[in-house]
Amino acid sequence: MKKVRLNGSHIKSLDEIIISGSKSESNRVLILKSIFQNISIINLSSSDDTKILEKNLNSTDFNLNVGHAGTAMRFLTAYLATLENKKFHLSGSKRMNERPIGILVKALNDLGFNINYIGNEGFPPIEIIGCKNLKNKVKL
């Protein structure tokens, strides 16, 4: 398998990314596509988790719901925090809202992002107020 290390300058010059179709690769490439809109994706997974992430990334709604998709919850938490001057409520199914997200939220807040719990501390749903991060290091 050929390995490619991507950085911003490489991605900006890409037209398309061909992936294996795995859910893991698909979710990661969807985040890249949200940052670099010129990319087209070949062989995107048809999994429910990937569809949920793609739907939420393309939504113009303030209230986002990931259902049972844990990867979408975590990826969206980090991605939405970077969208300056935008506010979101991110939630999931009853079961998703019982799954801890505190370590990720603390790390992002320690970097200068603005994420708050709407209900129970350490668990979704969360409010995300997008901003520019102020730090580049965090201790976990």
Q: PLM features: what roles do these ranges have?
A:
Residues 1-140:
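Structural preference for solvent-exposed beta-strand-turn elements
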